[in-house]
């Protein structure tokens, strides 16, 4: 699982350790063997340091081992759109995916950000690989799906939600993710 919110009390995901263990066990029961914890990082809202998230991740991994739930956890962040994205990574506030060059980011859900191309260029020019979280769910990409293709042509990889495929996020998201799948534009689920 490339995108999850399993760390307790960090963002809008799990509320406590018991819920985190339950969520991970459910993922294991449907076949997952590895989960990347991608807690939100949003300036002035969700600002838990990489060191603190790593400590929570280690605590959760220990809890899983105690309960004999064999599944590997990795650290990452889902970084909210900001022109400071590179400095957040370099200052160890936000995390790349498991210390790699992959950077998971998200846009505002209901507004098209300005300077998208400059934002993507800043990630690429710092030698990172941008990965856009759930492109099928943004209002502006639902209105202008060609933006997804433009971003892909710029070098952005796409991470879609399984829930979009089954209609959990509405018909528009489902139609867009189906077209993305047809065009090999879903790189991670």
What is each of the regions a protein language model found here?
Residues 17-24, 85-89, 114-116, 176-178:
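Short, acidic/polar
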Residues 28, 124, 181-182:
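Non-catalytic positions within long, well-ordered alpha-helices that form the structural scaffold/packing
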Residues 5-14, 145-152, 160-163:
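Metallo-beta-lactamase
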Residues 4, 40-41, 78-79, 135, ...:
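Active-site metal-binding loops of divalent metal-dependent hydrolases
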Residues 47-159:
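Extended substrate/RNA-proximal surfaces in nucleic-acid metabolism proteins
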């Amino acid at each position: 699982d490339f995108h999850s919110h399993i760390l307790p009390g960090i963002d809008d995901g799990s509320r406590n350790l018991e819920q985190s263990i339950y969520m991970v066990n459910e993922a294991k029961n449907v076949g997952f063997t590895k989960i990347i914890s991608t807690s939100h990082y949003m300036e002035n809202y969700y600002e838990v340091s990489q060191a603190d998230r790593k400590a929570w991740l280690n605590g959760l991994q220990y809890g899983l081992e105690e309960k004999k739930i064999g599944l590997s956890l990795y650290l990452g962040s889902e970084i909210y759109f900001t022109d400071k994205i590179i400095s957040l990574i370099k200052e160890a506030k936000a995390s790349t995916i498991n210390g790699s060059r992959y950077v998971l980011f998200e846009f505002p859900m209901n507004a098209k950000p300005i300077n998208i191309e400059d934002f993507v260029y800043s990630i690429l020019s710092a030698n990172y690989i941008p990965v856009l979280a759930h492109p099928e769910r943004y209002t502006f990409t639902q209105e202008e799906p060609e933006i997804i293709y433009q971003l892909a042509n710029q070098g952005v990889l796409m991470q879609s939600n399984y829930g979009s495929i089954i209609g959990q996020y509405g018909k528009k998201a489902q139609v867009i993710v189906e077209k993305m799948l047809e065009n090999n534009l879903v790189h991670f689920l």
